């Protein structure tokens, strides 16, 4: 059973996948910052890879008031790095729709290597085949 308000630790993998799908569908139908923030929230804890193939995930902490902060904490090995929501929004506005050769093509923005990996996983950008090999998704989706 899926309850939209249920914490992700308490729902099944299938329900979590549905939650992410619905958030992305909502954003594609109405591409507002608020709806994209919903996508970011649902993908917290999911594994991504950078341009060079290094794995990472992110978490979003809650502030004293119980609301989520607009800061992503990138979990890479032993250290965490913060990534500001404003950086993600800036990069989002720089997507032109074509294959994005490298992270800096989306702008000289702090944390871009992580944003690039996230945008690829979200299906917002395409990357060259040699980069797909590193990022682990070279499969042709139409070949089945």
Give the ranges of each region predicted by the language model.
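BZIP DNA-binding basic region
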Residues: 1-22
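Long, low-complexity, charged/polar intrinsically disordered regions in eukaryotic proteins
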Residues: 20-78
């Amino acid at each position: 059973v899926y309850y939209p308000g249920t914490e992700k630790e308490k729902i099944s993998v299938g329900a979590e996948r549905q939650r992410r799908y619905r958030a992305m569908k909502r954003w594609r139908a109405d591409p507002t910052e608020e709806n994209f923030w919903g996508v970011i929230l649902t993908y917290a804890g999911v594994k991504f890879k950078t341009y060079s193939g290094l794995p990472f995930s992110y978490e979003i902490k809650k502030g004293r008031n119980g609301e989520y902060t607009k800061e992503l904490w990138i979990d890479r090995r032993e250290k965490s790095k913060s990534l500001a929501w404003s950086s993600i929004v800036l990069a989002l506005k720089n997507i032109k729709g074509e294959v994005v050769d490298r992270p800096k093509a989306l702008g000289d923005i702090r944390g871009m290597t992580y944003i690039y990996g996230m945008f690829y996983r979200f299906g917002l950008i395409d990357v060259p085949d040699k980069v797909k090999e590193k990022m682990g998704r070279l499969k042709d989706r139409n070949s089945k």
